[in-house]
Every structure is written in C-alpha cells, then in structure tokens.
Amino acid sequence: GCPRILMRCKQDSDCLAGCVCGPNGFCGSP
C-alpha cells in the first residue's frame, strides 16, 4: 500500500512506492 504521508506531487514518480499522484495534487493509494 501507500504510506499515509501527505506528499505533494505532479506525477506518480514524485510519490513513494505504491502511491500514485491524485487529482488533488497529493500522493495517495491507487
């Protein structure tokens, strides 16, 4: 799963493993 840490992102590669970049501009679970 995706670690529950608020991380801003522009693309999935900005996020930790298991996370994707959501439409709100933050990383989250796929």
From Swiss-Prot:
Record-annotated disulphide pairs: 2-19, 9-21, 15-27
GO molecular function: serine-type endopeptidase inhibitor activity
Keywords tagged on the record: Disulfide bond, Knottin, Protease inhibitor, Secreted, Serine protease inhibitor
InterPro entries tied to this protein: Prot_inh_squash, Proteinase_amylase_inhib_sf
Keyword Magnesium found: no
CDD domains, sorted: PlantTI
Main location: secreted
One Gene Ontology cellular component annotation held by this UniProt entry: extracellular region
Domain of life: Eukaryota
Subcellular location: Secreted
Site positions for Reactive bond: 4-5
Coiled coil is among the record's keywords: no
Free-text comment about domains: The presence of a 'disulfide through disulfide knot' structurally defines this protein as a knottin.
Family listed: Belongs to the protease inhibitor I7 (squash-type serine protease inhibitor) family.
Stated role: Inhibits trypsin.
Name used for this protein in its record: Trypsin inhibitor 2
Organism: Ecballium elaterium
